[in-house]
Amino acid sequence: MIIQGKCHTFGNDIDTDAIIPARYLNTTDPGELARHCMEDADPTFAGRVQKGEIIVAGKNFGCGSSREHAPVAIKAAGVAAVVAASFARIFYRNAINIGLPIFESPEAAAGIKAGDEVKIDAGKGEIVNLTRGETYPVAPFPPFMQELIAAGGLMPYVARKVKTSV
């Protein structure tokens, strides 16, 4: 899996309330959630982000309350991947479950600046900053996780597996 795009940067401890504020939790419509994605961290983000772009953040991205709305909002906004120095474990699981690729790399989080163009090679385990000519390590995704992401998340992945096994 290769993902390439322009980066939007955020700091440490971006919690799920900054990703999608609690006042929007009464909706499950992905399009509506996308319109408010990152609203409390950067009110202009949802209007600027383009399909295929990448969020890069510091430590503990997705901390706070466990809400599937957070990765859904990010994915629905068109974000192709999230790179962070570290993730809150529940956010990590929720993101993978809905098919949002996320990559933990403290080196990439420190080196990538807003507007940089990067290429993530999930199989090879590297992030190349095409703007700065730097390469950062990232743990490669095992093949089954690449399949799960490519399927669009856990539910579509399981549905395919069940369908092909019958």
UniProtKB/Swiss-Prot annotation:
Family: Belongs to the LeuD family. LeuD type 2 subfamily.
Catalytic activity entry: (2R,3S)-3-isopropylmalate = (2S)-2-isopropylmalate
NCBIfam families according to UniProt: LEUD_arch
Protein's GO biological process: L-leucine biosynthetic process
UniProt keyword terms in alphabetical order: Amino-acid biosynthesis, Branched-chain amino acid biosynthesis, Leucine biosynthesis, Lyase
Pathway stated in the Swiss-Prot or TrEMBL entry: Amino-acid biosynthesis; L-leucine biosynthesis; L-leucine from 3-methyl-2-oxobutanoate: step 2/4
InterPro entries: Aconitase/3IPM_dehydase_swvl, AconitaseA/IPMdHydase_ssu_swvl, LeuD, LeuD_type2/HacB/DmdB
Species the sequence originates in: Moorella thermoacetica (strain ATCC 39073 / JCM 9320)
Leading EC class: lyase
UniProt EC number: 4.2.1.33
Coiled coil residues, start to end: none
Function, as annotated: Catalyzes the isomerization between 2-isopropylmalate and 3-isopropylmalate, via the formation of 2-isopropylmaleate.
Annotated signal sequence range: none
Protein name (database record): 3-isopropylmalate dehydratase small subunit
